[in-house]
Amino acid sequence: DESLDNIVRSYIKEKYKKPGDVFLGVVHRLDRPVSGCVVYARTSKALSRLSELFRTRDVKKTYWAIVTDRPPSEEGVLSNWLKKNEQQNKSYVYDKEVKGSKLAELSYLVLARSEKYYLLEVDLRTGRHHQIRAQLAAAKCPIKGDLKYGAPRSNEGGGISLHSRKVTFMHPVKNEEISVVAPLPEDRIWKLFSNV
């Protein structure tokens, strides 16, 4: 299973006819079972500038999630404390601060529903380990296929129904808004919501 980094590095080498090793700066990552937008930098200067935008939260990340149960309301804000368990590679949700926890906030909106599922648009206000997965599970609407966080069944292929739909930021030099939108995965569950 070739890594996304290697695929992008090969693409840059071919597209820009780069001899030798190609610089590729990883600006941020997605959890392995998550699909969608990932931002890379082709130069060290771009990496520094883009990393600063992500560090200062001057980037808007919008996710789409298919959940198995009705969310608490049609739209809302989830605010909890998350604590990461390194051994289990899992985050636990608390209603109040506990030692080692960090505040986690996201907003969500129900975009559509099918007979069995709900499509949510999720905007992160903070960026914590497994934040969307843990908070939606704690709200009793786990992401489809996410066994780690309480989904009843896995998805075909092992992924989860969480998709980094859009990443928006200001170009660090041109001061123009950049929006990167990822097409939805080509599987039957996402096709239920292809008209959204």
Label the model's feature ranges.
Residues 1-196:
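RNA pseudouridine synthases
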